[in-house]
Amino acid sequence: MNQIVVGMGDALWDCLPEGKKIGGAPANFAYHVSQFGFDSRVVSAVGADADGDEILEVFAQKGLRTQIERVPYPTGTVQVTLDAMGVPCYEIKEGVAWDNIPFTDELKRLALNTRAVCFGSLAQRNEVSRITINRFLDTMPDCEEQLKIFDINLRQGFYTKEILCDSMRRCNVLKINDEELVTISRIFGYPGIDLQDKCWILLAKYRSCIVPGDP
């Protein structure tokens, strides 16, 4: 059994008032998994620009293996500003590289040899990456040992009921926090019950293991 673990989706720069730092939940997942000795990969896309060069350089310095395509779009960034109360505000740039991850023959081979993959909703806001993520999930061997982890990670308005349904149908592990559970319940039409009952409904409908997300 192959033991490759993949973090798939957005790889970007968080541009903070004090400077920029690398971001993207899938990349963070792959990095932390690698610290336990697993063979992990980051699957994403960056632009043919300085920001893309830096992302690849940072991953290389961390010893993190990647399958990141260069595409004719700018490398993703999130502009972070503080309002008058010091609360951070986020502007997630659209039309960027990780919105356009291609499904390649190399990616198909990786899917066939992947034990676990973590993906989210944000990277599916554009059709190109959404199709690639779904093809990757559908190409993975269909057996109980494979983990398809949907870190729902709702961001602004970058999700639809269709995206959420498709992802929950394909995953067998759902990572979700209380706030996201309330949002999902409203979208799917069962808001007036407690959180535990909401979890049981999701479990019965999608037959996924549900794990708590960050607050």
PLM region spans:
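Substrate-binding N-lobe of the ribokinase-like
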Residues: I4-V5, D14-V87, E94-I101, D105
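Nucleotide phosphate-binding site architecture
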Residues: W13-D14, V182
